């Protein structure tokens, strides 16, 4: 089967879509600094986001997706009430490295991208 005809569950397509959404890359970047509790992660994401604050529901959904794909590990303590924290797995750390490299490439190429956009817009 050719690469163009694979199903929607293709891992490459799924992970690229995940990285391309509004919050996933930011979550990876923040968790690369260390394990964080849900509320701390939400606070940091809200502080560094150029857009609106992330909602509790969206953060929970993103974390569940990252956990399902093996990029994030969830730790629940036996305290009352339980404390939940999140950290990158080894796969998540490797994905973070790749995401960081993509960010660096965009930064290095931003002038070239802006020129291409200007040329396109004036055509």
Ranges and model annotations:
Residues 1-11:
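Long, low-complexity, charged/polar intrinsically disordered regions in eukaryotic proteins
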Residues 10-58:
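N-terminal helix-turn-helix DNA-binding core of bacterial DNA-binding proteins
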Residues 11, 29, 76, 90-123:
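Amphipathic alpha-helical dimerization/coiled-coil segments
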Residues 59-67:
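Basic amphipathic alpha-helical segments that dock to polyanions
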Residues 67-87:
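Beta-hairpin "wing" of winged helix-turn-helix
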């Amino acid at each position: 089967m050719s690469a163009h005809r694979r199903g929607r569950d293709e891992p490459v397509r799924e992970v690229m879509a995940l990285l391309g959404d509004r919050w996933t890359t930011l979550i990876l970047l923040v968790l690369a600094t260390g394990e964080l509790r849900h509320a701390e992660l939400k606070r940091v994401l809200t502080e560094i986001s150029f857009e609106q604050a992330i909602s509790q529901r969206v953060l929970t959904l993103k974390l569940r997706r990252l956990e399902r794909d093996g990029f994030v590990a969830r730790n629940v303590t036996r305290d009352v009430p339980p404390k939940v924290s999140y950290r990158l797995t080894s796969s998540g750390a490797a994905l973070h490295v790749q995401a960081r490299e993509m960010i660096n490439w965009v930064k290095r190429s931003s002038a070239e991208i802006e020129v291409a956009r200007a040329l396109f817009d004036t055509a």
